[in-house]
């Protein structure tokens, strides 16, 4: 099952990261503005948020097996749509379709991991997160290489349908051997929407992932603009996601206590160093800034999921909180690339964007101090 989880995780980001290295060509071919081009990343991320908010309904009405299978099919179809000549409506439709598939899977998987790997939740959550980040790195690194070996540059984006199909068959075979899905499990109902902590977690998760979403949308374009090649710029994004994968594996493994604040603070400091490097010394040590920023972003992602799961020992309740956190968070994160595009149009460069995210990280450090685990059991409002 772990191998299948990794295969599925590898398909969660290439639809987003494969676009970045080709964004200048896509803009030129389709006539998109910076703000519209940003929607290629923003739209699927916002869609992830909407589907995460619907996670509770999906959990009750659609079997785990079918929801993941349908989602992988949607990701494959979304990638295949990019086989055609790039037009704004077509590209945005493919982003929306893929975002639906990604959103459903991300709403389902945390509670699946907590239920099936209860004694190893931090390690498996780290592995799942590392697979997400690793898939993003593959999308950024392999796409420019495929362009060099393809007669039609834009059709290389459609190749990312293949791993989704492989994961679909692997999941369908493996899930047939598993016991009945958890959507039939009953627990004490809890209204997470009415708790201030749930909203705090949502904003926290959103601001962290907003930095990631802006980087995968604009980091290659930023370096192309200041003189780097498309191949080199895509490689920097791949190195950032390699750092993310390392952070996603290492930091949850270091989380031996329920208090996640020290590790979260470390992850945020690394992000701040990376964004400051992009602002002041972008061409001097680009590999270092990309790796350090990725390490912080990758470590923060699974730690946020663990932080939410820590709030209840019941997988269904914890899963409901994670779904709400991801829902609000991904909607916020999805606005970040669009806002970055607006800042780019206003200022003429990307420095305002990196400065904005650096300020967000400082705010996140202050919020982190509030996550004392001793208060977790007191934070819920039960339904009558």
Curated annotation (Swiss-Prot):
Keyword Repressor among record annotations: no
Record InterPro entries: CynX-like (IPR004747), MFS (IPR011701), MFS_Cyanate_Porter (IPR052524), MFS_dom (IPR020846), MFS_trans_sf (IPR036259)
Alphabetically ordered keywords of this record: Cell inner membrane, Cell membrane, Membrane, Transmembrane, Transmembrane helix, Transport
Pfam families: MFS_1 (PF07690)
GO terms of molecular function: transmembrane transporter activity
Organism: Escherichia coli (strain K12)
GO annotation, biological process: cyanate catabolic process
Protein topology in the membrane: Multi-pass membrane protein
Record-annotated membrane-spanning stretches: 3-23, 34-54, 68-88, 89-109, 122-142, 153-173, 204-224, 235-255, 263-283, 287-307, 322-342, 354-374
Main location: membrane
Its biological purpose: This protein is part of an active transport system that transports exogenous cyanate into E.coli cells.
Entry protein name: Cyanate transport protein CynX
Family: Belongs to the major facilitator superfamily. Cyanate porter (TC 2.A.1.17) family.
Subcellular location as annotated: Cell inner membrane
GO cellular component, as recorded: plasma membrane
Keyword Membrane: yes
């Amino acid at each position: 099952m772990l191998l299948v989880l990794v295969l599925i995780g590898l398909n969660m980001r290439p639809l987003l990261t494969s676009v970045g290295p080709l964004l200048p060509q896509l803009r030129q071919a389709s006539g998109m503005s910076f703000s519209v081009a940003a929607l290629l990343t923003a739209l699927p991320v916002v869609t992830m948020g909407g589907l995460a908010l619907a996670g509770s309904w999906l959990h009750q009405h659609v079997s785990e097996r079918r929801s993941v299978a349908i989602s992988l099919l949607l990701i494959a179809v979304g990638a295949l749509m990019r086989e055609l000549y790039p037009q704004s409506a077509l590209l945005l439709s493919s982003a929306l379709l893929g975002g639906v598939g990604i959103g459903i899977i991300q709403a389902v998987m945390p509670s699946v991991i907590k239920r099936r790997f209860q004694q190893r939740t931090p390690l498996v959550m780290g592995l799942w997160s590392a697979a997400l980040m690793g898939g993003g790195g593959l999308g950024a690194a392999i796409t420019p290489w495929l362009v060099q070996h393809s007669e039609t540059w834009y059709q290389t984006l459609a190749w990312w349908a293949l791993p989704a199909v492989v994961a679909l068959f692997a999941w369908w075979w493996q899930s047939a051997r598993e016991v009945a899905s958890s959507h039939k499990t009953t627990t004490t109902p809890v209204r997470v929407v009415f708790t201030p902590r749930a909203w705090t977690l949502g904003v926290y998760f959103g601001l962290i992932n907003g930095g990631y979403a802006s980087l995968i949308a604009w980091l290659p374009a930023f370096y192309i603009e200041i003189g780097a090649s498309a191949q080199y710029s895509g490689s920097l994004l791949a190195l950032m996601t390699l750092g993310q994968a390392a952070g996603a594996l290492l930091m949850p493994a270091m989380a031996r206590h329920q208090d996640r604040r020290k590790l979260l603070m470390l992850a945020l400091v690394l992000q701040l160093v990376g964004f400051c490097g992009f602002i002041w010394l972008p061409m001097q040590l680009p590999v270092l800034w990309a790796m350090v920023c990725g390490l912080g972003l990758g470590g923060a992602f699974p730690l946020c999921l663990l932080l939410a799961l820590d709030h209840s020992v019941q997988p269904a309740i914890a899963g409901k909180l994670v779904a709400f956190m991801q829902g609000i968070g991904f909607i916020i994160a999805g606005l970040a690339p669009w806002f970055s595009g607006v800042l780019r149009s206003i200022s003429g460069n990307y420095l305002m964007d990196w400065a904005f995210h650096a300020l967000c990280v400082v705010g996140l450090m202050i919020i982190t101090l509030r996550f004392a685990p001793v208060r977790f059991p007191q934070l819920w409002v039960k339904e009558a």
